[in-house]
């Protein structure tokens, strides 16, 4: 990223703090947030906290306005968090506000658009998630420890644009070779997605973003990566 490592970084819901601590060691100025003091326990993360050298702001609810001024950060990290929220709408809007012009968001979340997840949903009606679905045994206040809101990329694509951000790249996290045979369906996915995005081009609300959406939906990482690892940039203006 431009200016790295001389960046002001915010790691939202930092968990045990591995990312925040690594960026701090690289020379970034890093803050992190926790929703509850036991966040990292609820989400089944093991091992010691690594946030001793990082300022952690407690009790930060990502459903509410964030307590930071406009353009306060050059980089915001939202790693394996969005799927735990009832909706990503408020936090994406706030990220757009607190990012400086030219700043970046790095977001990762389970990729329900990958072909394996689509195949699983077609036959079972359930998304292929990394963690089990929230069960009846959970207290309502602990629901956020599970993947209660799998992220729909077309909606995320729109939310980012509304917040003043534009997707710059998608990267692979993990590709499972046992699912490689599903790539045989790529031509069918291409044709279906092209028809779907062209169908909306005559709609004034959708016309501006449909071609860009198609481009990202057909990226190899979108179709085969276990996680969606996305970098988006806030416009300079």
Stretches found by the model and what they are:
Residues 1-4, 66:
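Glycine-rich helix-loop-beta junction characteristic of Rossmann-like nucleotide cofactor-binding loops
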Residues 6-15:
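Conserved class I S-adenosyl-L-methionine
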Residues 8, 29-31, 166:
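Residues at the starts of beta-strands that form the adenosine-phosphate
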Residues 16-64:
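Class I SAM-dependent methyltransferase SAM/SAH-binding core
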Residues 18, 22, 35, 86-94, ...:
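S-adenosyl-L-methionine-dependent methyltransferase catalytic module, highlighting the catalytic core
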Residues 63-76:
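A short acidic, Gly/Pro-enriched loop at the edge of an enzyme's catalytic core
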Residues 75-86:
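A short SAM/SAH-binding and catalytic strip from SAM-dependent methyltransferases
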